[in-house]
């Protein structure tokens, strides 16, 4: 899975941590934004965070999984901002997701 992160001006955002949550962990994250992610990757100089999901680990029981990718500033009960995109990922397929860090409220 390739996640491209852009800032509010549409420019690539480098060095940004992108969190990935599986179905179960995202339900917990929705109630507590300090929940540890299933996986995390940082955007490179091209604004791309790459998640490699080996079939035997992620798709052993099913050929498709729903993952949510999150960029978060701050955390806890207040003073935080979250941008996310959820997507069904099929084993063996490359998926490209874009997250735009728009300013609140948007």
Predicted regions and their residues:
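Surface-exposed coil/turn segments at beta-strand junctions on protein surfaces, enriched
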Residues: 42-46, 62, 90
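Short, ordered, surface-exposed loop/turn motifs in non-cytosolic proteins
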Residues: 9-34
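A mature extracytoplasmic/lumenal domain signature
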Residues: 17, 22-24, 53-57, 73-75, ...
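A short, solvent-exposed beta-strand micro-motif common in secreted/extracellular proteins
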Residues: 57-77
């Amino acid at each position: 899975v390739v996640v491209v992160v852009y800032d509010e001006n549409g420019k690539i955002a480098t060095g940004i941590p992108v969190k990935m949550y599986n179905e179960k962990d995202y339900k917990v994250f929705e109630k507590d934004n300090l929940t540890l992610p299933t996986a995390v990757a940082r955007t490179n100089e091209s604004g791309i965070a790459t998640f490699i999901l080996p079939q035997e680990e992620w798709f052993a029981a099913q050929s498709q999984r729903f993952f949510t990718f999150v960029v978060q500033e701050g955390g806890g009960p207040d003073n935080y901002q979250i941008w996310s995109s959820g997507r069904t990922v099929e084993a063996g397929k490359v998926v490209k997701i874009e997250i735009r860090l728009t300013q609140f409220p948007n």
